[in-house]
């Protein structure tokens, strides 16, 4: 790299058609799509992945790793922004099932199935630091938080701006943070009730119980505490309130399908 940065540099190289083709490009508008933000129906709203070559350079300019991987546009409404987030996924069909590098030194594990180059979401046009700041402030509470590293992105050799490199919150993330769980035996649900893995039956049963029972009764409350980590939920609410998070649907919650597991 001729230009040295004081942070990590990620380079994504791919066939331009994979990005800009109106028919198949993941960054293109395509057709048809709604002509108002966030442009529902555009190509970047599709669940598409394209092959790419990834290079990851440390702050001193040295190459840490390079590999073939899959790239996709990441996020929800912020997909409509000019600077979009990217998911980078290691898969066997590209050569390796994992990124074998300690991308986030603060975590104890050193391999990842996927990572995210995040455009900072709703803070994209402002500090780009709010989400990272709250995550770092809450990391001693026991909440599962995404580690980060500041990074710059070059897309097919063109400078694409400042990003925050984050862990992907998937079953591999949960397994890395909770080695004791069986990651194939999980229910993972998003705040909009979208099921990422498993189903929502156990969660709905818990909600029905809460709605139909008096939680001022100690026995009823103890039952709820046996099904969800109440302290974990309180810590999450503290983060939401203190951080003035109005995008309250942007959450994932999970449990292992065992009798003793609690929703977190």
Which residue ranges define each predicted feature?
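Regulatory N- and C-terminal appendages and interdomain linkers associated
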Residues: 1-74
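Short, well-structured beta-strand/strand-turn elements
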Residues: 140-154
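Conserved protein kinase catalytic/activation segment
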Residues: 252-264
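Compositionally biased P/S/T/G-rich terminal and signal peptide-adjacent segments
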Residues: 79-111
């Amino acid at each position: 790299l001729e230009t040295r940065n004081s942070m990590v540099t990620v380079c994504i190289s791919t066939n331009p058609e994979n990005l800009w083709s109106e028919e198949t490009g993941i960054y293109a508008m395509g057709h048809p799509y709604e002509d108002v933000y966030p442009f529902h129906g555009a190509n970047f709203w599709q669940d598409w992945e394209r092959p790419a070559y990834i290079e990851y350079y440390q702050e001193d300019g040295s190459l840490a790793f390079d590999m073939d991987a899959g790239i996709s546009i990441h996020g929800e409404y912020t997909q409509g922004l000019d600077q979009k987030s990217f998911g980078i996924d290691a898969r066997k069909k590209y050569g390796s099932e994992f990124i074998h590098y300690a991308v986030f030194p603060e975590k104890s594990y050193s391999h990842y199935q996927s990572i995210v180059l995040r455009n900072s979401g709703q803070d994209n046009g402002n500090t780009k630091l709010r989400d990272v700041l709250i995550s770092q402030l809450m990391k001693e509470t026991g909440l599962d938080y995404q580690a980060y590293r500041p990074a710059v992105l070059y897309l097919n050799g063109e400078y694409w701006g400042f990003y925050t490199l984050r862990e992907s919150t998937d079953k591999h993330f949960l397994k890395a943070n909770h080695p004791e769980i069986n990651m194939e035996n999980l229910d993972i649900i998003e705040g909009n009730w979208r099921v990422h893995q498993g189903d929502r039956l156990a969660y709905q049963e818990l909600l029905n119980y809460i709605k139909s029972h008096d939680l001022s009764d100690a026995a009823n409350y103890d039952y709820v505490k046996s099904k969800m980590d109440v302290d974990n939920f309180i810590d999450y609410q503290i983060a939401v309130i203190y951080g003035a998070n109005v995008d309250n649907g942007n959450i994932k919650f999970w449990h292992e399908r065992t009798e003793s597991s609690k929703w977190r």
